[in-house]
UniProtKB/Swiss-Prot annotation:
Source organism of this protein record: Bacillus anthracis
Domain HTH marR-type per the UniProt entry, residue ranges: 1-137
One function term, GO molecular function aspect: DNA-binding transcription factor activity
Upregulation: Up-regulated following infection of host macrophages.
Additional remark text: Deletion results in virulence attenuation.
Record protein name field: Uncharacterized HTH-type transcriptional regulator BA_1941/GBAA_1941/BAS1801
DNA-binding segment(s): 53-76
PANTHER family: TRANSCRIPTIONAL REGULATOR, MARR, TRANSCRIPTIONAL REPRESSOR OF EMRAB OPERON
Pfam families the UniProt entry points to: MarR (PF01047)
Sorted UniProt keywords: DNA-binding, Transcription, Transcription regulation
Disulfide bridge partners, by residue number: none
Amino acid sequence: MRDNTIGSLIWLRLIRFTNQSNQMSNEFLKRFDLTTAQFDVLLQIRTYQPLTQMELAEKVTVTQGGISRMLTRLEKEGYIVRKQDWKTKTISLTEQGEAALERALPEQLAFQSSFFDDVLNEEEQKILYELMTKVHKHSEKKELPKE
């Protein structure tokens, strides 16, 4: 462990937390017949609809190929509709998709929040949020080191 910097230890913690919380969220969302990725996609569609597949892919953590397969499945389940407007195909929620999201949303948000509410007070959560926002913004501009 002596070779690890505090930065690399933080990075490892974040990866482990993300993996564990995603696994738990996937298990939790089974009661709503959704995965974490589907929940995120439905939430992003509701927030920004109508939007294109490319716009959606920029907002979620699913690959372009993965988003295409997921949208096909969500469309078959009646949760979304894709409309062709001249050259652009847009995605929107159906009433059924809105209802599915409304069933899951309050409980999933409470579950997600519990990861932090159970161990951090409000001030600690604000500080963590500010620090994570700062790191995230930096990561968006980060470039790979030169070889």
